[in-house]
């Protein structure tokens, strides 16, 4: 749906007797008929644009919206006097400008104080300051606070006069900003006319109780009542870009760059992309950028007696058709502030957009007035940040790491910088193409990002700070002289792939070490005590060259190593012996076949039932396995076509690695497993079963465990502290099980493998 024609919304509403005067009409309508029809079309299109952009609940098919939109365009072309500033046809218009007009804010756009303490004590300190300023005794009730997110975007002031958007301006220096009205009109979430209704009128006492729903305007005339809307209402908020929209935008930019389009570039982060779009001189370009908006406050107001609380004010703005973030709350005292800060901190990485903190505001507008301002900052509000997820630092060098499969990864060596709650000195550059695309050079000032548990990465270069003596553009092949930095083998870049690889295989010590660590990992052979430091010793000392040699280790060989005591050696030998009894799926996963992860290994084991059948399967036979495509099938076939790999497999079997016969399921049997074809999602903490144990039980019964909830999900298994997955399951009306319900499902399914999963109404179900 384009910003100029938001093409998604609902069955053609009741026309309220207004005749259709669109292009299909036999004769041009008179002015009075056209005016009535145009008013109805504006109202209807605004209503459905609100459903689509703000409520994410479209009702009108795209084609029907487009038909109504085109009819309005035709009327306005026929009678230009009927073209109003709030018409949906006016979202994208105007000429390319030479520059922006500076406008003065009627009420300054002041910034709020930032709490430098990012811990819980920062919230406690703010509450203590407010209570002190209000001279409250220690036994006074806790203060009510409105808590919100601190969006990482561009602050904007929207000026509505009698309910119609007439101007949009940036914050600028707080006193004056730039007029960006034409660009802001392209943002579908921002209403060109407010949905004002009598209950939002100037009489403060006519407002419904806080928390009640405000009455909304309805289609069938102009939305709301323009004569009831405030004479002036300035709405402050943030223009931002969602993460998924940002990724899609950058993907389009990369395609344009690949085509050779001049002047195109990718964007470093969503904030820069949003700010750049708002300040585009050509509104047609701004319209192509996927921008969003959240309202969070007011500027100048004339003709509206405000609600008594900040939360009530935001409710009113939402009822008037403005997008207001749902992640907000009214909390009590310091404890409430701390809880909100911690809750949002846990959600931060899963939000659809970037934030850099939360905002606390005294909820009572009367108390806000009492507290006032100090040095142009409100005493009644504060921004409480989280540790920054992006920081700037200097690139000291680029090293090349060799992975388990021979992949060569460029790694940035950085001046240490505190980002994402930890000190970072290394960050991935992913591959040569990414390093070149970002034009990363030694000596550059770079932007490093670390969010949650994500590996730190260099996301861009600050070109304005590039020194004159900066290094050359990165060329991996030239840098290495075409040879692996560990073993000296030739490197190659397979056609169609982004990664260079060492061709040395297990001859390469780096690949050998990574292959051993992979083989010994918990979800593979689970050899307890075989960690990276010990593997380094074993490989560097020449004790281990191949995987089968692990099972020739004895206490004497191990105790000969530095810092290896007899007890540790005995424990490791016992762990090696224990690992010999495994499953076919674990064994396949442990071999480190490219493209074969845990799920694929389990699918292969279920489908073929025996290792020899997997090793001898053709590419076509492999593609018959669920979720195995041509690339994965070719990778498996290539692995087992190598004599060395077959020899390793036979030596491991000869060393005593085995799996129980009953675990081998022929392809025909796989389809008859009790949960075959069923998809389950695990969320939260189960009382007795660990996540891995629950996953194993489900997969052993033929079910598939997915990481996300969708309409294709059959069951959601929810434990304590289940989050957004449980909420989505409820929205979709899916069957929700607790641990007891899961076990009952497995038992009942096993007793009757032909039972339809939806025919199990007696299974214990978690409360919804």
UniProtKB/Swiss-Prot annotation:
It comes from the Bacteria. Its cofactor is Mg(2+); Mn(2+). Residues 670-759 form the BRCT domain. The keyword Acyltransferase does not apply. It is an enzyme of class 6 (ligase). Pfam families: BRCT, DNA_ligase_aden, DNA_ligase_OB, DNA_ligase_ZBD, HHH_2, HHH_5, Nlig-Ia. One of its GO terms (molecular function) is DNA binding. The active site is at 150 (n6-amp-lysine intermediate). It catalyses: NAD(+) + (deoxyribonucleotide)n-3'-hydroxyl + 5'-phospho-(deoxyribonucleotide)m = (deoxyribonucleotide)n+m + AMP + beta-nicotinamide D-nucleotide. InterPro entries: BRCT_dom (IPR001357), BRCT_dom_sf (IPR036420), DisA/LigA_HHH (IPR041663), DNA_ligase (IPR001679), DNA_ligase_AS (IPR018239), DNA_ligase_CS (IPR033136), DNAligase_adenylation (IPR013839), DNAligase_N (IPR013840). Residues 1-11 have a biased composition (Low complexity). Its EC number is 6.5.1.2. Zn(2+) binds at residues 484, 487, 502, 508. GO terms for biological process: DNA repair; DNA replication. Keywords: DNA damage, DNA repair, DNA replication, Ligase, Magnesium, Manganese, Metal-binding, NAD, Zinc. Residues 1-28 are annotated as: Disordered. NAD(+) binds at residues 62-66, 111-112, 148, 171, 238, 361, 385. Coiled coil: none annotated. One of its GO terms (cellular component) is cytosol. DNA ligase that catalyzes the formation of phosphodiester linkages between 5'-phosphoryl and 3'-hydroxyl groups in double-stranded DNA using NAD as a coenzyme and as the energy source for the reaction. It is essential for DNA replication and repair of damaged DNA. Belongs to the NAD-dependent DNA ligase family. LigA subfamily. PANTHER family: CHROMOSOME TRANSMISSION FIDELITY FACTOR 18, DNA LIGASE. This is DNA ligase. It comes from Leptothrix cholodnii (strain ATCC 51168 / LMG 8142 / SP-6).
């Amino acid at each position: 749906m384009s910003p100029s024609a938001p093409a998604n919304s609902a069955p053609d509403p009741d026309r309220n007797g207004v005749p259709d005067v669109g292009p299909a009409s036999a004769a041009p309508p008179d002015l009075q008929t056209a005016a009535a029809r145009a008013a109805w079309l504006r109202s209807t299109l605004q209503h459905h644009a609100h459903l689509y952009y703000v409520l994410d609940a479209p009702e009108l098919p795209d084609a029907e919206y487009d038909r109504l939109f085109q009819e309005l365009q035709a009327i306005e072309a026929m009678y230009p006097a009927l073209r109003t500033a709030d018409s949906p046809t006016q979202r994208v218009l105007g000429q390319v400008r030479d520059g922006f007009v500076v406008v003065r804010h009627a009420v300054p756009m002041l910034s709020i104080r930032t709490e430098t303490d990012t811990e819980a004590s920062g919230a406690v300190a703010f509450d203590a300051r407010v209570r002190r300023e209000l001279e409250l005794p220690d036994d006074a009730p806790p203060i009510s606070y409105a808590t919100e997110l601190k969006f990482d975007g561009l602050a904007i002031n929207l000026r509505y006069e009698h309910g119609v958007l007439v101007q949009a301006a940036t914050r600028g220096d707080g006193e004056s900003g730039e007029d960006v009205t034409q660009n802001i009109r392209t943002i579908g979430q921002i209403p060109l006319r407010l949905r004002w209704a009598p209950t939002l009128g100037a009489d403060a006492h006519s407002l419904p109780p806080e928390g009640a729903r405000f009455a909304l305007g309805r289609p069938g005339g102009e939305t709301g009542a323009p004569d009831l809307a405030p004479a002036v209402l300035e709405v402050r908020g943030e223009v931002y870009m969602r993460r998924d929209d940002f990724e899609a935008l950058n993907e389009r930019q990369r395609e344009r760059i690949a085509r050779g389009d001049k002047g195109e570039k990718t964007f470093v982060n969503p904030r820069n992309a949003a700010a750049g779009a708002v300040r585009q001189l050509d509104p047609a370009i701004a319209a192509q950028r996927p921008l969003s908006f959240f309202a969070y406050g007011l500027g100048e107001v004339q003709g509206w007696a405000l609600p008594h609380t900040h939360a009530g004010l935001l409710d009113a703005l939402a009822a008037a058709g403005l997008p207001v973030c749902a992640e907000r709350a009214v909390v009590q005292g310091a404890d409430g502030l701390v809880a909100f800060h911690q809750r949002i901190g846990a959600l931060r990485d899963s939000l659809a957009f970037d934030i850099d903190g939360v905002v606390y505001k005294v909820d009572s507008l009367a108390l806000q007035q009492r507290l006032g301002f100090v040095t142009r900052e409100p005493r009644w509000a504060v921004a409480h940040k989280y540790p920054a997820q992006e920081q700037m630092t200097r690139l000291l060098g680029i090293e090349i790491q060799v992975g388990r499969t021979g992949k060569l990864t460029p790694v940035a060596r950085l001046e240490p910088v505190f980002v994402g709650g930890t000190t970072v000195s290394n960050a991935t550059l992913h591959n040569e193409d990414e390093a070149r695309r970002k034009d990363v050079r030694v000596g550059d000032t770079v932007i490093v990002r670390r969010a949650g548990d994500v590996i730190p990465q260099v996301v861009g270069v600050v070109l304005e700070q590039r020194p004159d003596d900066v290094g050359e553009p990165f060329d991996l092949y030239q840098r290495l002289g075409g040879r692996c930095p560990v073993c000296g083998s030739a490197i190659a870049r397979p056609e169609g792939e982004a990664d260079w690889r060492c061709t040395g295989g297990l001859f390469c010590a780096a690949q050998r070490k990574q292959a051993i660590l992979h083989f010994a990992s918990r979800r593979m052979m689970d050899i307890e005590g075989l960690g990276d430091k010990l593997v380094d010793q074993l490989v560097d000392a020449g004790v281990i060259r191949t995987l089968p040699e692990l099972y020739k280790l004895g206490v004497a060989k191990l105790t000969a190593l530095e810092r290896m005591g007899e007890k540790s050696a005995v424990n490791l030998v016992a762990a090696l012996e224990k690992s010999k009894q495994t499953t076919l799926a674990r064994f396949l996963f442990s071999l480190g076949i490219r493209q074969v992860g845990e799920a694929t290994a389990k699918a292969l084991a279920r489908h073929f039932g025996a290792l020899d059948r997997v090793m001898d399967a053709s590419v076509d036979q492999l593609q018959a396995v669920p979720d195995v495509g041509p690339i994965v099938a070719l990778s498996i076939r290539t692995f087992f076509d190598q004599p060395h790999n077959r020899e390793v497999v036979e030596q491991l079997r000869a060393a005593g690695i085995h799996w129980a016969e009953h675990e081998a399921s022929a392809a025909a049997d796989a389809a008859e497993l009790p949960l075959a074809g069923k998809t389950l999602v695990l969320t939260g903490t189960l009382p007795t079963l660990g996540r891995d144990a629950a996953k194993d039980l489900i997969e052993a019964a033929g079910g598939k465990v997915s990481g996300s909830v969708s309409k294709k999900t059959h069951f959601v298994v929810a434990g304590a502290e289940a989050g957004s997955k449980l909420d989505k399951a409820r929205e979709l009306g899916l069957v929700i099980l607790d641990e007891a319900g899961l076990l009952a499902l497995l038992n009942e399914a096993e007793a009757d493998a032909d039972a339809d999963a939806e025919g199990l109404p007696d299974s214990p179900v978690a409360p919804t």
